[in-house]
């Protein structure tokens, strides 16, 4: 059994770690609230844009934009949103497993995959396991801006425009609540039609002024950008929630470990006292 001094040292070490995890839990809780506010502020725009674009996909368009047309699938692209930091439980690895399973399905059909990575964890993971990485951006911090995301988005849209990609998806964690974050793979291009059953029953006619091509080019690009930005802010809220939960679990586990070590310490101290008493009694008997 370890000595009492060694056990006291272990208890002190766990207590110091517990202070760190508690502080990280509180910081993550504060950042999560800010991330939720940012997510809530951008969500109406993203959802409205998705609704409008969904109407367009169902409409009788005088100009059929390439982003609205299905193609034979030979290569697909994924915009993968991950975190820049760790200590957030299985948030990243669960997302990567979901993506790898989907990529395996495409591979079995003879379809190749391109990856545009957002976040250092995705860059590190796919740099190790393999995958065709065509763009990446890292170090966006806790307040990402659309200008920081333009690079990967532009690369993927250019590949789609040139016919090198036939489908484009965004991969991120969807924020459900503080305790639940869900890996999500959402198709961006070609534009999926609106899922609302009532909308599908209607025929939509639009008048475009001055030019439908110029208007749709701009509108559809804004749509993709808005969905990517929303995916990033949702992933950030998911990251902070997962980190808060992970740090709380670490703090609680530290408390349990301290109790166990305290019991071991008490037993060691009791054994030491018993041994001393035995030696004293033995010495007295010898006299």
Swiss-Prot record:
Its main location: membrane. One of its GO terms (cellular component) is plasma membrane. It comes from Yersinia pestis. This is ATP synthase gamma chain. Keywords: ATP synthesis, Cell inner membrane, Cell membrane, CF(1), Hydrogen ion transport, Ion transport, Membrane, Transport. It is found in: Cell inner membrane. The keyword Transferase does not apply. Produces ATP from ADP in the presence of a proton gradient across the membrane. The gamma chain is believed to be important in regulating ATPase activity and the flow of protons through the CF(0) complex.
């Amino acid at each position: 059994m370890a000595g009492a001094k060694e056990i006291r040292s272990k208890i002190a070490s766990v207590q110091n770690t517990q202070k760190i995890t508690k502080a990280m839990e509180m910081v993550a809780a504060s950042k999560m609230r800010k991330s939720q506010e940012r997510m809530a502020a951008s969500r109406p725009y993203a959802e409205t844009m998705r609704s409008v674009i969904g109407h367009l996909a169902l409409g009788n368009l005088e100009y059929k934009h390439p982003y609205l047309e299905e193609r034979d699938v030979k290569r697909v692209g994924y915009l993968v949103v991950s975190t820049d930091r760790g200590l957030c439980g299985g948030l990243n690895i669960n997302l990567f497993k979901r993506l790898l399973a989907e990529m395996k399905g495409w591979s079995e059909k003879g379809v190749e995959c391109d990856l545009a990575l957002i976040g250092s964890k995705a860059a590190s993971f796919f740099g190790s396991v393999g995958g065709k990485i065509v763009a990446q951006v890292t170090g966006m911090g806790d307040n990402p801006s659309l200008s920081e995301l333009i690079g990967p988005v532009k690369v993927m849209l250019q590949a789609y425009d040139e016919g090198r990609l036939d489908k484009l998806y965004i991969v991120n964690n969807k924020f459900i609540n503080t305790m639940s974050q869900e890996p999500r793979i959402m198709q961006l291009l070609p534009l999926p039609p609106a899922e609302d059953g009532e909308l599908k029953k209607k025929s939509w006619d639009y008048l475009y002024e001055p030019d439908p091509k110029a208007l749709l080019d701009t509108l559809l690009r804004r749509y993709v950008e808005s969905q990517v930005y929303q995916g990033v802010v949702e992933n950030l809220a998911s990251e902070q929630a997962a980190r808060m939960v992970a740090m709380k679990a670490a703090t609680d586990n530290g408390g349990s470990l301290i109790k166990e070590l305290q019991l071991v310490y008490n037993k060691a101290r009791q054994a030491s006292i018993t041994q001393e008493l035995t030696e004293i009694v033995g010495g007295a008997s010898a006299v």
